[in-house]
From Swiss-Prot:
Organism: Schizosaccharomyces pombe (strain 972 / ATCC 24843) (Fission yeast)
Keyword field contains Nucleotidyltransferase: yes
Modified-residue entries (Phosphothreonine), positions: 323
PANTHER family found in the cross-reference section: CHOLINE-PHOSPHATE CYTIDYLYLTRANSFERASE, CYTIDYLYLTRANSFERASE
GO cellular component: nuclear envelope; nucleus
Name of the molecule in the record: Probable choline-phosphate cytidylyltransferase
Length: 362
């Protein structure tokens, strides 16, 4: 650059009115060629200024809208993948390490392991291309003290997690609050959990220290599915489940049901069975009655057609009688009528035969 750079600097230090027009044009042309600047025409510059004014007047998005529109995972858990964050969250997110699997840690109680848990673990597994997913599980003593009673014990919950295909490692007796020492001990690169602040006795958000050091990856919750929701469904239909288990032979003491409650549920169960039986029999009886009426009407129509147009060589139409209830009544009536008219004829035949036998003897 040398002398030319010095000349340019000297020119810039001089007042504009002291520089000749030709000299100004030479300077501008020289700087344009050197730095490849694009000089806009006055009209184009005015258009750019108008666009910038429009951008300034347009309402800016709130931080909440920005955080919702930009997430490190996609909406659908099947296509979860890491995305570059053009707009950061309220906390930083570090770049993943290269040349080795990324060790991601996800913790929780995971009681009554359900689809919401599975989708959370799937997001954690797919947040980077190569992830080793570690799942932390607090023991029963810690969980019952800080969160409440669980349906499954810690061994059952750990075994359920081991059968999930997204999980590479289950860490039992995990701490309730993640500390830097814990991250260092297990060489954890990131912690994956939903972004809702999880309060404890000592902190408003137990994941806040992890967020501050850039090791927190937010996942999305599955709405409408939770362990509390499953328990609510069971409690809502409590009597039905108890009656079902009692009918299957489960002891009432195992169900924590008193003798009075058991007798009440037994009575309700018997009433329900009786009602269902009557309903089912009524349905079957109605179905048979409809079939008999249909058969009777079709037989009557056939008889009428045969009487109107008899077949050659047949004096009476042959048709199968009705079946079912009406068929039985019809056959019974036919037997009664035939026996009523046949008895005198049979008696006359017996009397005639006896008289002829007497005449022969004489």
């Amino acid at each position: 650059m040398g002398e030319e750079g010095i000349k340019i600097n000297d020119t810039h230090k001089r007042r504009i009115d002291e520089v000749e027009p030709s000299e100004k044009e030479d300077n501008v042309e020289r700087q344009t060629k050197k730095y490849n600047f694009e000089i806009d025409e006055p009209e184009e510059q005015e258009k750019k200024d108008e666009k910038e004014d429009d951008k300034e007047e347009s309402p800016s998005k709130s931080l909440e809208e920005i955080s919702q529109s930009v997430s490190p995972v996609e909406e659908e858990p099947r296509d979860v993948r890491f995305k570059e964050l053009s707009t950061p969250f309220s906390y930083p997110i570090n770049d993943p390490p290269e040349g080795r699997p990324v060790r991601v840690y996800a913790d929780g109680v995971f009681d009554l392991f359900h689809i919401g848990h599975m989708r959370q673990l799937e997001q954690a597994k797919k947040v980077f291309p190569n992830v080793h997913l570690i799942v932390g599980l607090p023991n029963d003593q810690l969980t019952h003290r800080l969160k409440g009673l669980t349906v499954m014990n810690d061994k059952e919950r750990a075994e359920a997690l081991r059968h999930c295909k997204w999980v590479d490692e289950v860490l039992e007796n995990a701490p309730w609050v993640i500390t830097p020492e814990f991250l260092e001990e297990h060489k954890i690169d990131f912690v994956a959990h939903d972004d809702i602040p999880y309060a404890s006795d000592d902190s408003g958000d137990i994941y806040l220290p992890v967020k501050k050091v850039g090791k927190f990856i937010p996942t999305k919750r599955t709405e409408g599915v939770s362990t509390s929701d499953l328990i609510t469904r069971i409690i809502r239909d409590y009597d039905q489940y108890v009656m079902r288990n009692l009918a299957r032979g489960v002891n009432r003491k195992e169900l924590n049901v008193s003798l009075f409650k058991k007798n009440e549920l037994d009575l309700r169960h018997h009433i329900k069975v009786l009602r269902d039986t009557l309903r089912n029999h009524w349905v079957s009886t109605t179905r048979d009655l409809k079939a008999d009426i249909k058969s009777f009407l079709s037989m009557a129509t056939t008889d009428y057609q045969l009487q109107k147009n008899p077949l050659h060589g047949s004096s009476e139409p042959s048709s199968p009688g009705p079946t079912g209830f009406l068929g039985g009544i019809n056959r019974w009536m036919q037997r009664r009528s035939s026996s009523h008219y046949d008895l005198p004829r049979v008696g006359n035949e017996i009397a005639a035969s006896s008289s002829s036998a007497t005449e022969e003897n004489h």
